[in-house]
């Protein structure tokens, strides 16, 4: 210890106010009779603490969703195909800021800053050319509104003779997060809620396997929130969306089937596992309060690496950190990872 206090060296305090002991055993706890593992709940049922499905990853492994952020639609299309050949199992398209905010590329300050620019139907035709959309899930964070991207995708698939009802995945909006990030919106929030409701109505009728609300936690995680705050703020946004959709006559079942979450995974291994498990449990209780049936109380979770744990100087270190973050996400029971 070199003269340093035992508690300071051997016990680790986290941002969440939790103190880690140096070692844990089966008898760790206030009482020797405490049980670590839950015995009255199973995966795929109850509050979904232990997972959203009964069989876990035995029937369907977690999705591998490498983000493709090339600026031009043709180059992004080639990258999507390349990633599938390399082992990805999800088409994950990252759009630029202008597209996410509904701004024409000609009027954008920095077109293609973080992803592909999509302005016209021709761009979407190029982006989706040769992609097997009926078999491989599709993922796109659409920014303020999913209606624009949804319409372009549907029109493209129809022109190609594809069955849009077989498309699964998410083309999801998150207008409140965009408002927090940008400080402003190009449309009134009420109009965006109207578009969100229309997206749900259309997909439930025409593409029931496609989700249109994508509530992501990265705006909070990258902004300094701890695990507890990250889950709380993310679910607060989701609750707001539920209430606004109910005002517009959307049934809680349809809302539940339209929601998808994305959480960042950080460096504190056990905290990240606990965060994902707790998130499913908390969300189950929230949906129960809204009167949802048990099958609608689970939440579909996509996980992403926390960027604040990465360095620009050493790729090898980033790979090691990424490995532990992926491991914690998988143990936590995510549906897909980016």
Say what each PLM segment does.
Residues 1-266, 271, 293, 297-304, ...:
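Catalytic alpha/beta active-site cores
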Residues 76, 273-274, 312-315:
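Short conserved micro-motifs at the rims of enzyme active sites and ligand-binding pockets
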Residues 272-284:
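Extended amphipathic alpha-helical segments enriched in small hydrophobics
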Residues 284, 306-317:
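Flexible, glycine/threonine-enriched loop-and-boundary segments that flank and lead into catalytic domains
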Residues 228, 313-325:
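Active-site-adjacent loop and "lid" segments of alpha/beta metabolic enzymes
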Residues 151-155, 281, 285, 321-328, ...:
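Contiguous, well-ordered alpha-helical segments that form the cores/surfaces of helical PPI scaffolds
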């Amino acid at each position: 210890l070199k003269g340093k206090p035992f508690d300071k060296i051997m016990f680790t305090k986290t941002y969440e106010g939790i103190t880690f002991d140096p070692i844990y055993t089966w008898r760790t706890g206030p009482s020797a009779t405490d049980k670590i593992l839950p015995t009255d709940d199973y995966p795929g049922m109850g509050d979904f603490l232990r997972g959203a499905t009964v069989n876990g990853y035995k029937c369907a492994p977690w999705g591998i969703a490498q983000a493709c952020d090339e600026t031009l639609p043709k180059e992004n299309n080639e990258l999507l195909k390349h990633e599938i050949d390399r082992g990805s199992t999800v088409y994950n398209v990252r759009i630029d800021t202008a597209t996410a905010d509904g701004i024409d590329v000609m009027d954008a300050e920095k077109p293609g800053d973080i992803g592909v620019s999509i302005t016209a139907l021709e761009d979407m035709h190029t982006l989706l050319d040769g992609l097997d959309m009926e078999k491989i899930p599709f993922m796109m964070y659409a920014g303020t509104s999913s209606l624009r991207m949804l319409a372009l995708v549907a029109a493209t698939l129809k022109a190609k003779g594809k069955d849009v009802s077989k498309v699964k995945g998410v083309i999801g909006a998150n207008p409140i997060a965009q408002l927090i990030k940008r400080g402003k919106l190009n449309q009134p929030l009420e109009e965006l809620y109207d578009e969100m409701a229309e997206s749900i109505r259309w997909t439930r009728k025409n593409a029931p396997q496609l989700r249109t609300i994508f509530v992501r936690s990265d705006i909070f995680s990258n902004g300094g929130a701890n695990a507890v705050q990250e889950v709380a703020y993310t679910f607060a946004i989701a609750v707001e969306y539920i209430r606004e959709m109910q005002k517009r006559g959307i049934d809680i079942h349809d809302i539940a089937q339209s929601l998808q979450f994305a959480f960042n995974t950080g460096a504190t291994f056990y905290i990240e596992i606990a965060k994902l498990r707790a998130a499913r449990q908390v969300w189950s209780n929230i949906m129960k309060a809204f009167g949802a049936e048990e099958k609608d109380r689970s939440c579909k979770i996509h996980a992403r690496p926390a960027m604040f744990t990465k360095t620009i100087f050493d790729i090898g270190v980033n790979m090691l950190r990424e490995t532990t973050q992926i491991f914690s996400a998988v143990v936590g029971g995510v549906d897909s990872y980016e």
